[in-house]
Structure formats: structure tokens, C-alpha cells
């Protein structure tokens, strides 16, 4: 493990592996950089991969108060560690974060961007966005109800059946999810009301590949909307892949895009 110091002096931990052009992975939802370690290992045969813990996750610090701009600065520090520029891959909500970072001043450092199933919940997608999501998360946090925070995320943000999540709460790994529950408030900060801010997305000039798996209709709907809004976008569907995409399915897509 290595680390960099972000602009506000927060320590950001990362793993570096492989050789070749630099690729930065922006992940971490209710977990740490180990979530994307299998993908990093596959990409390492052709790229130097920087897989980092977002602030508040894993071995990285979490200086308060939180602001989305601090996460842009964290990514900026990782890009500097990667030599000043890199290809960037972001998955799900962190993919939205990477998209906003590209539009928020980091475009010169991001050679190309690839994002997997940005979880915007749009009108016409067949899903209803959760109401007062961040406020409810914050209230549950104040009451010490971390398990209910995670349940709220899975049921109302992800769209999983409540009955399934009730079963998941009995799993031995659920306690680890509860430990990461405070980071859901950070994610809610940049996801907002889950709508896609078309004007903001349209200003992202970085060449971007928007990928989905075709298995979750509302996420495919969002992927199409993002790609149609970006000025320099390509689309790709990895047929048959759920939201928890297999590294073996994703790696060749990223290799092709980042090598072209």
C-alpha cells in the first residue's frame, strides 16, 4: 500500500500494480479498494493501475467537513501520483463522481473516462427516486441506526426487494456494511435527488465510454441518457452482466477502450 496527501492534508491510500499507461479506478461503495482489486489485477498486464480508497473508506482518512470538491482533490492527488494524467474508470455512484470531477477541472488530466451503470433514477425508467434520501440517512445516523441506513440504501437507492435485504441483514458480512454506513451520506451528497443534471453532464468534454450490462432496465436507461447527453461519448453493453459486474467481463472492454 502507498498513500498520497490530498489538498486538505487527508491521507488517501492506494495500491499500484502492473506496468504500462496509467489507469485509475474510482470505486468504493460500502467497502474499500479490495472491491476492485480483481479488476486491477487483470488490467495490470497492460497498464499501471492505481486503485485507491476514497476518503472515509478503507485506509484513507476522512477529514471533516465533507464536500464533493474534496473528492475531486483526492482524485487529483492520485492522478499526480500516476504521473500527472491517466485513464479513469469509475463504477456506479463513484462513476458519477468521476464524471463530475472531469467536468470540475480535472479534464486535462483524464485522458479518457469509462463509467459503469451511473445510478441516476430518471423519469420513464420505471423506478421512483427515494424521497428525502440524504435527510433520512442523516437522521438514522444520528440515531445510531446504521443497519437501517444500509437497508435504506439497498432498498430505495439500489432497488433491491425489502424481503431480500431483510435476509441479508442476517449474513455475517452485514456488520462490515454497517461500519461503512456513514459513507452513504457522502455518496448522497453528490447523487442528490438521483436525477441527471443534464447541463452539468453536457459540459464534460472528456471522451467517455458509458457501459451497462443490460440486466437492470433502469440502469440501462440511465446509461443511454448519460451517453446521449455527453458531447464525446461511446456506448457499450456487456450483455448479461448484473450491476455487480464480473472483472473478467469488464477488463477486456476497458483494455480495448483505453488502448484505442
Region spans (language model):
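Hydrophobic, aromatic-rich cap/lid helix
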Residues: 172-196
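Conserved HGGG/HGGXW glycine-rich cap/lid loop of the alpha/beta-hydrolase fold
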Residues: 3-61
Amino acid at each position: 500500500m502507498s498513500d498520497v496527501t490530498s489538498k486538505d492534508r487527508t491521507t488517501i491510500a492506494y495500491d499500484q500494480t502492473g506496468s504500462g499507461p496509467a489507469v485509475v479506478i474510482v470505486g468504493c461503495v460500502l467497502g474499500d479498494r479490495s472491491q476492485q482489486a480483481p479488476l486491477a489485477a487483470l488490467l495490470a498486464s497492460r497498464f499501471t493501475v492505481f486503485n485507491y480508497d476514497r476518503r472515509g473508506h478503507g485506509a484513507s482518512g476522512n477529514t471533516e467537513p465533507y464536500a464533493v470538491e474534496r473528492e475531486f482533490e483526492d482524485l487529483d492527488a492520485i492522478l499526480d501520483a500516476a504521473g500527472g494524467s491517466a485513464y479513469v474508470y469509475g463504477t456506479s455512484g463513484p462513476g458519477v463522481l468521476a464524471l463530475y470531477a472531469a467536468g470540475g477541472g480535472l479534464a486535462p488530466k483524464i485522458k479518457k473516462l469509462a463509467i459503469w451503470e451511473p445510478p441516476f433514477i430518471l423519469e420513464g425508467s420505471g423506478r421512483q427516486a427515494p424521497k428525502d434520501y440524504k435527510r433520512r440517512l442523516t437522521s438514522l445516523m444520528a440515531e445510531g441506526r446504521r443497519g437501517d441506513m444500509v437497508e435504506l440504501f439497498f432498498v430505495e437507492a439500489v432497488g433491491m426487494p425489502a424481503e431480500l435485504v431483510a435476509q441479508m441483514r442476517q449474513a455475517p458480512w452485514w456488520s462490515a456494511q454497517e461500519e461503512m454506513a456513514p459513507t452513504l451520506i457522502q455518496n448522497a451528497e453528490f447523487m442528490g435527488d438521483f436525477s441527471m443534471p443534464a447541463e452539468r453532464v453536457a459540459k464534460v468534454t472528456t471522451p467517455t465510454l458509458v457501459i451497462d450490462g443490460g440486466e437492470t432496465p433502469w440502469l440501462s436507461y440511465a446509461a443511454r441518457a448519460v451517453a446521449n447527453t455527453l458531447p464525446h461519448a461511446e456506448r457499450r453493453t456487456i450483455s448479461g452482466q448484473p450491476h455487480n459486474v464480473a472483472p473478467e467481463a469488464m477488463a477486456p472492454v476497458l483494455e480495448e477502450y483505453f488502448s484505442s
